[in-house]
Amino acid sequence: MSKPDVSTFQGLILALQQYWAEQGCVVLQPLDMEVGAGTFHPATFLRAIGPETWNSAYVQPSRRPTDGRYGENPNRLQHYYQFQVVLKPSPDNIQELYLGSLKHLGVDPGIHDIRFVEDNWESPTLGAWGLGWEVWLNGMEVTQFTYFQQVGGLECYPVTGEITYGIERIAMYLQNVNSIYDLVWTISPDGTPVTYGDVFHQNEVEMSHYNFSHANVDFLFQTFDTCEAESSKLIDAGLPLPAYEMVMKASHAFNLLDARQAISVTERQRFILRVRTLARNVAQAYFDARLKLGFPMAPAALRDEVIARANAEGEK
């Protein structure tokens, strides 16, 4: 199979998809909802729960309303992309697999300065944390490596390995440009470059105005409360997947309220706690749902061990 042209943003994504598909990952499509990071995708957050084997890779558009800069900052956007890889259980050679992906992109670890800098990760809203590293390529952070220890307040057993590529940053390095907007997204049939700015600059300008000045605060507070109530109701109904969608909607409403500066510092902590409580309830409900199914994707010995432990705890 020929390798995509990694000198374009489009080709870079295709090359990462190709590489991780060859490593046996389920290549998924982006989640069709607003999330702040690829970790929120059910393929990471929910699949990290329980003993079942899971390997996947996907691009995830990520929205962080407070990071908008009206299209004026060459390195900071309120909408950008992550390439997410989830390997469960985390393989012993995960670091070698990652370095292999860089080679596939034309970045030779023998030539370039690649450093793993300890940087443990935490998501207060998801009740998740892990041991990890930032990966620096010639002095610029391009990837976050995390070994999940806990998700939704539940211990990760086995541990899930997560690799999150900052694909705009890698593309800026490969294309040797100083502004995200100057990245070549692809080349038109007539040879004209289509840039990242052609695709997204207007969106950054307008969405920054929306996030900071026009998002309806009353509607967002109401949305948060409604999604919170819906999530709780769905958990009671034994439906963790739609309940989790409500968690993501509530989280995005919170992020927009944060951008509108509608939440005080003390209120902010209270909102984070409300989302975390929902996420924990979803995590437990998802574990229980998979337990009821007998953890069909888990190796037999591990499945039996976790089921026996869950049954013993249930009898206490």
UniProtKB/Swiss-Prot annotation:
Belongs to the class-II aminoacyl-tRNA synthetase family. Its EC number is 6.1.1.14. The keyword Protein biosynthesis applies. Pfam families: tRNA-synt_2e. The keyword Cytoplasm applies. It comes from Teredinibacter turnerae (strain ATCC 39867 / T7901). It comes from the Bacteria. The lineage of its organism: Bacteria, Pseudomonadati, Pseudomonadota, Gammaproteobacteria, Cellvibrionales. This is Glycine--tRNA ligase alpha subunit.
